[in-house]
Amino acid sequence: MAEKIKLEIVTPEKKVLSEMVDIVVAPGQEGEFGVLPHHIPFLSKLKVGELRYRIGQTLRCVAIMGGYAEVLPDQVTILAPAAEEAGEIDVIRAKAARERAERRLAETKDRLEFTRAQAALQRAVARLKVAEKT
């Protein structure tokens, strides 16, 4: 049996996921990073995006809304403000959120509102990207 690494994804509301996986690929602030069993320990800030993991031949995805990753030789813990597995994502709601954010980006002149609209767009796009992979 091949070695596995434990992946845990935790939000303030709940433990989203706890699985033994073959590999984790996370959206780090400085770019994606992959983790296999026996990886050197490190901490990383995460950006909004798609976290992928593989169990056997099955690739699965989770939309994460930023946060932090703690990597240990036998475990990856993701602490995120929000995270959704592909099956939990409401595609209609995510598309509506994307359209609202795009409209706000086109209409706003306020710098703070523009930044908020950009963040909303990133979240909606991440959800849609993960939902497409189901």
From Swiss-Prot:
It is found in: Cell inner membrane. Keywords: ATP synthesis, Cell inner membrane, Cell membrane, CF(1), Hydrogen ion transport, Ion transport, Membrane, Transport. Its main location: membrane. It is a peripheral membrane protein. The keyword Flavoprotein does not apply. CDD domains: F1-ATPase_delta. One of its GO terms (cellular component) is plasma membrane. SUPFAM superfamilies: Epsilon subunit of F1F0-ATP synthase C-terminal domain, Epsilon subunit of F1F0-ATP synthase N-terminal domain. The keyword Cytoplasm does not apply. It comes from the Bacteria. GO terms for molecular function: ATP binding; proton-transporting ATP synthase activity, rotational mechanism. Transmembrane segments: none annotated. Produces ATP from ADP in the presence of a proton gradient across the membrane. F-type ATPases have 2 components, CF(1) - the catalytic core - and CF(0) - the membrane proton channel. CF(1) has five subunits: alpha(3), beta(3), gamma(1), delta(1), epsilon(1). CF(0) has three main subunits: a, b and c. Belongs to the ATPase epsilon chain family. This is ATP synthase epsilon chain. The gene is atpC.
